[in-house]
C-alpha cells in the first residue's frame, strides 16, 4: 500500500521509499527527512481538491506532501504491522 492511499487519521509503518530513477532527488530527500523503514507515519489531513496535498506526521514533525510524492512511500497499515 502507498502512503497516498491511506485515509485521514490512518497510521502505518513505512516499508520503503521507491526511487523513480537512479539518484532520484525526491526519494533521497524523503529519506533524509525521516521517511525510512520501520518509522510510524500518520495522515493528519488531506487537501480539499483531490486530496492534494497530504499532511503527514512522523514523530513530532509534520510534512505537506503532494500525492505524487506520497505515492513513492510504501507503507504497511498499522493493523497489519
Q: Could you tell me what each predicted segment is?
A:
Residues 17, 33, 44-46:
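Residue-level recognition of beta-strand microenvironments
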Amino acid at each position: 500500500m502507498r502512503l497516498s492511499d491511506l485515509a485521514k487519521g490512518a497510521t502505518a509503518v513505512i516499508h520503503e521509499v521507491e526511487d523513480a530513477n537512479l539518484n532520484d532527488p525526491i526519494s533521497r530527500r524523503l529519506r533524509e527527512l525521516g521517511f525510512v523503514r520501520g518509522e510510524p507515519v500518520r495522515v493528519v489531513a488531506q487537501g480539499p481538491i483531490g486530496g492534494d496535498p497530504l499532511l503527514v506526521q512522523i514523530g513530532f514533525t509534520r510534512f505537506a506532501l503532494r500525492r505524487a510524492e506520497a505515492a513513492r512511500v510504501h507503507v504497511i497499515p498499522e493493523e497489519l504491522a
